[in-house]
From Swiss-Prot:
<keyword id="KW-0028">Amino-acid biosynthesis</keyword>
<dbReference type="GO" id="GO:0009088">
    <property type="term" value="P:threonine biosynthetic process"/>
</dbReference>
<keyword id="KW-0067">ATP-binding</keyword>
<dbReference type="InterPro" id="IPR000870">
    <property type="entry name" value="Homoserine_kinase"/>
</dbReference>
<dbReference type="GO" id="GO:0004413">
    <property type="term" value="F:homoserine kinase activity"/>
</dbReference>
<dbReference type="InterPro" id="IPR013750">
    <property type="entry name" value="GHMP_kinase_C_dom"/>
</dbReference>
<keyword id="KW-0791">Threonine biosynthesis</keyword>
<protein>
    <recommendedName>
        <fullName>Homoserine kinase</fullName>
        <ecNumber>2.7.1.39</ecNumber>
    </recommendedName>
</protein>
<comment type="pathway">
    <text>Amino-acid biosynthesis; L-threonine biosynthesis; L-threonine from L-aspartate: step 4/5.</text>
</comment>
<comment type="function">
    <text>Catalyzes the ATP-dependent phosphorylation of L-homoserine to L-homoserine phosphate.</text>
</comment>
<dbReference type="GO" id="GO:0005524">
    <property type="term" value="F:ATP binding"/>
</dbReference>
<dbReference type="InterPro" id="IPR020568">
    <property type="entry name" value="Ribosomal_Su5_D2-typ_SF"/>
</dbReference>
<keyword id="KW-0418">Kinase</keyword>
<dbReference type="GO" id="GO:0005737">
    <property type="term" value="C:cytoplasm"/>
</dbReference>
<dbReference type="Pfam" id="PF08544">
    <property type="entry name" value="GHMP_kinases_C"/>
</dbReference>
<keyword id="KW-0963">Cytoplasm</keyword>
<comment type="similarity">
    <text>Belongs to the GHMP kinase family. Homoserine kinase subfamily.</text>
</comment>
Length: 297
């Protein structure tokens, strides 16, 4: 039996579109074992109990690369990461599948090979990298090779996820983005991405509200999320450090000072006045990333 734990992730972090991401302490667990024959799923809806399941697709990709053919598989899932909410559920499935397959096959692939394969399956590194490595990462793909650097985040900051009861697919969220951007908007985001990394690294938390601004994706996607701007405004009134759309949304992620004890209950009271139901969940940065059989990958 192979046990793999993968954290949720929040990508983009405001201006860092498709390159910044952070792992948080919300997890999916995967329990995988080879059996005599067949493919058995436990812990997921019936519609996902087939060969199109993303976990199995990722596992098969890994097995094919290694040249390993399992006789059969039992895959059990314990999921705490909500699907289609902008918290890296698909990245968690891909990473969990690839890591568990590699472990079943005797650990033939090294960490870099696993990471490159996961990005190949998922399509982009902003969620995959922090899910794999933990912490906050800045990532790019260069000729199909994943290049990344860990971002050191000063102590004293925490996150609060505002998770709605409605979903938003990544495909739909990408469809509203423009085909091209103005040069000045690119400069706007480049500067704020640099500021975000520096502010988090140096503990200049008062600068985060400026660094969260973006002109590439958030305003386009906000129209798909009812009450986004009123929620953002209320978060700012409650002395948040910064507010941004988590991944493609619809989850709204809030940065707070560690000592802030009142934000969660106050924003919850505000959210209860809205039509949709919102879950308020305080989170910390997960520093381990993916863990297999109680050891870091």
């Amino acid at each position: 039996m192979v046990e793999v734990r993968v954290p949720a992730t929040s990508a983009n972090i405001g201006p860092g579109f498709d390159c910044l991401g952070v792992a948080v302490n919300m997890y999916n667990k995967f329990f995988v074992e080879e059996i005599e024959e067949g493919l058995i799923f436990e812990g997921c809806a019936d519609k996902f109990k087939n060969e199109n399941n993303l976990i199995y697709v990722a596992m098969k990709k890994c097995f094919n690369k290694i040249g390993y053919k399992p006789t059969g598989l039992r895959i059990k899932i314990e999921s705490d990461i909500p699907v289609s909410r902008g918290l890296g559920s698909s990245a968690a499935c891909v990473v969990g599948g690839i890591v568990s397959a590699n472990e079943l096959a005797g650990g033939a692939l090294n960490k870099k090979e696993l990471l490159d394969l996961a990005v190949e399956v998922e399509g982009h590194p902003d969620n995959v990298n922090p899910a794999f490595c933990g912490g906050m990462t800045a990532s790019i793909s260069d000729n199909r090779e994943v290049i990344y650097s860990k971002v050191k985040v000063s102590e004293g900051i925490k996150f609060c996820a505002l998770i709605p009861d409605f979903t938003l697919s990544t495909e739909k969220a990408r469809a509203v983005l423009p085909k091209s951007i103005d040069y000045k908007d690119g400069i706007f985001n480049v500067g704020r991405t640099a500021l975000m990394i520096s502010a988090l690294n140096n503990g200049d938390f008062h600068l985060i509200k400026y660094a969260c601004k973006d002109k590439l994706h958030q305003d386009h996607r906000a129209k798909l999320i009812e009450n986004f701007y009123s929620i953002k405004k209320q978060c700012e009134k409650l002395n948040s450090l910064g507010v941004f759309l988590s991944g493609a949304g619809p989850t709204i992620m809030v940065m707070l000072r560690e000592e802030d004890k009142d934000f969660s209950k106050n924003i919850k009271s505000f959210l209860e006045t809205l039509k949709n139901k919102w879950e308020v969940r305080e989170l910390k940065i997960d520093k381990l990333g993916t863990v297999v059989n109680n050891r870091k990958v």
